[in-house]
């Protein structure tokens, strides 16, 4: 006969309890996964989401701890922190709303993808940014500034429009107009330079866009061929507003050193205060590049190029008209107080003899036929995008939200840094 000691009985009891706990944990995990799948199916069903009982279930708040209920309540978030989705038929946008089809661009913090909205069947360019990468470089202010600028310029024909923005715990999503005529940079690389009428047309549309931004007290600061797109008809569309500076009035200045080396104005290199005329310098640099094939003071050696911008006189070859020479000399004036646009901003550019052939009212209404048609056959025509992007596989993580149970502390911290990012347009913007 086997006699069980007290220790043996305790070990047996502990083993049974541990086994029961393991079974219970496995059961709870399975139920939780099943419940999560069930809720996801409901959330993805637009008809179910409209049912009052379903809405009340999805809005249940977690119970508060008794000791917390009597604690001093936290102050309400400031207006800039509140998530304002607005009255919209799609107030809870999420990655699974889209089919992400192709990578069409890349940047420091993420990718731009061609996406088709599943319900609307509409095509968009979705800019997907990694929050942790943004925070690591302390660029969250620039990202929120880009969002704010996009909200302001949705009505202008030569500025890319933001349809809505949303976020997951680890990513930000800008849902933008899909523009597939190619970057101006791409077309310049292929053709080396443009004839003067074509360069004038593009410069006029760019100037119109910059003038509109200035009317909103926004300085663009990063004009370059890579940020200038052509739409399917051949009109200019300005994109990428990450370096925009808001609240710069007519005589206001700022001093942040930023931009792209080839297009930096002398006052920026000198680290002096600068104003809206920095954009007119950049317009001059882009116009020069369209006419001659390279930026005006270009050198492969960045230090030499900076010295050229600061000290080298502007050299113009004789193969352009006198009005083109005059406008380039005015825009690329090293002294910003004497630069074309210093007194009356866009009106000076608009009234310059170089643009005398432009009917500005027809231009803004897109009644002028562009000098070049990209001839795209439809949204799936990607011929004007760099194959380096379009041949890259679409990451699986782009189209799904991370499991909240698996979020790390750093991801949660990143999630909290972009309160107020999400945006949906008011209903009247769809009318």
Swiss-Prot record:
Residues modified to Phosphothreonine: 256, 369
Catalysed transformations (reactions): L-seryl-[protein] + ATP = O-phospho-L-seryl-[protein] + ADP + H(+); L-threonyl-[protein] + ATP = O-phospho-L-threonyl-[protein] + ADP + H(+)
Protein kinase domain ranges (all copies): 98-355
Activity regulation information from UniProt: Two specific sites, one in the kinase domain (Thr-256) and the other in the C-terminal regulatory region (Ser-422), need to be phosphorylated for its full activation. Phosphorylation at Ser-397 and Ser-401 are also essential for its activity. Activated by WNK1, WNK2, WNK3 and WNK4; which promote phosphorylation by mTORC2.
EC number: 2.7.11.1
Domain spans labelled AGC-kinase C-terminal: 356-431
One Gene Ontology CC term in the entry: mitochondrion
Modification type Phosphoserine: residues: 74, 78, 397, 401, 422
Superkingdom of origin organism: Eukaryota
Region (Disordered): 64-92
GO molecular function, one term: protein serine kinase activity
UniProt keyword annotations, A-Z: Apoptosis, ATP-binding, Cell membrane, Cytoplasm, Disulfide bond, Endoplasmic reticulum, Kinase, Membrane, Mitochondrion, Nucleotide-binding, Nucleus, Phosphoprotein, Serine/threonine-protein kinase, Stress response, Transferase, Ubl conjugation
Subcellular compartments: Cytoplasm; Nucleus; Endoplasmic reticulum membrane; Cell membrane
Region (Necessary for localization to the mitochondria): 1-60
Motif (Nuclear localization signal): 131-141
GO BP field: apoptotic process
PTM summary: Regulated by phosphorylation. Activated by phosphorylation on Ser-422 by mTORC2, transforming it into a substrate for PDPK1 which phosphorylates it on Thr-256. Phosphorylation on Ser-397 and Ser-401 are also essential for its activity. Phosphorylation on Ser-78 by MAPK7 is required for growth factor-induced cell cycle progression. Ubiquitinated by NEDD4L; which promotes proteasomal degradation. Ubiquitinated by SYVN1 at the endoplasmic reticulum; which promotes rapid proteasomal degradation and maintains a high turnover rate in resting cells.
EC class: transferase
Family, similarity comment: Belongs to the protein kinase superfamily. AGC Ser/Thr protein kinase family.
UniProt name for this protein: Serine/threonine-protein kinase Sgk1
Species assigned in the record: Bos taurus
Protein's gene: SGK1
């Amino acid at each position: 006969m086997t006699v069980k000691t007290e220790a043996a009985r305790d070990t047996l009891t502990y083993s049974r309890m541990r086994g029961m706990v393991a079974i219970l944990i496995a059961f709870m995990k399975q139920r939780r996964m099943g419940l999560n799948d069930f809720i996801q199916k409901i959330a993805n069903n637009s008809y179910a989401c409209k049912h009052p009982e379903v809405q009340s279930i999805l809005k249940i708040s977690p119970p508060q701890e008794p000791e917390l209920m009597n604690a001093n309540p936290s102050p309400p978030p400031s207006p800039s922190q509140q998530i304002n989705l607005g009255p919209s038929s799609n107030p809870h946008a999420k990655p699974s709303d889209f089919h992400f089809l192709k990578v069409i661009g890349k940047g420091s913090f993420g990718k731009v993808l061609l996406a088709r909205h599943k319900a609307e069947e509409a095509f968009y360019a979705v800019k997907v940014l990694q929050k942790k990468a943004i925070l690591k470089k302390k660029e969250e202010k620039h990202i929120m500034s880009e969002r704010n600028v996009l909200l302001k310029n949705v009505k202008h024909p030569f500025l890319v429009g933001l349809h809505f923005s949303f976020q997951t715990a680890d990513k930000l999503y800008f849902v933008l107009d899909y523009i597939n005529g190619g970057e101006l940079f791409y077309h310049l690389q292929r053709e080396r330079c443009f004839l003067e009428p074509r360069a004038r047309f593009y410069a006029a549309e760019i100037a119109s866009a910059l003038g509109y931004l200035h009317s909103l007290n926004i300085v663009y600061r990063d004009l370059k061929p890579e940020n200038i797109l052509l739409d399917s008809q051949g009109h200019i569309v300005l994109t990428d507003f990450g370096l925009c500076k808001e609240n710069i009035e007519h005589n206001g200045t700022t001093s942040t050193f930023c931009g792209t080396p080839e297009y930096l104005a002398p006052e920026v290199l000198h680290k002096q205060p600068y104003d809206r005329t920095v954009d007119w310098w950049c317009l001059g640099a882009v116009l020069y590049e369209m006419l001659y094939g390279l930026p005006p003071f270009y050198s492969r050696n960045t230090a030499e190029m900076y010295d050229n911008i600061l000290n080298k006189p502007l050299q113009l070859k004789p193969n352009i008209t006198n009005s083109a020479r005059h406008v380039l000399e005015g825009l690329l004036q090293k002294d910003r107080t004497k630069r074309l646009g210093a007194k009356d901003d866009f009106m000076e550019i608009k009234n310059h003899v170089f643009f005398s052939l432009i009917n500005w009212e027809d231009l803004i209404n897109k009644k002028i036929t562009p000098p070049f048609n990209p001839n795209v056959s439809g949204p799936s025509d990607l011929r004007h995008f760099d194959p380096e992007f379009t041949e890259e596989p679409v990451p699986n993580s782009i189209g799904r939200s991370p499991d909240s149970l698996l979020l790390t502390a750093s991801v949660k911290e990143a999630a909290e840094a972009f309160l107020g990012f999400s945006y949906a347009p008011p209903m009247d913007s769809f009318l």
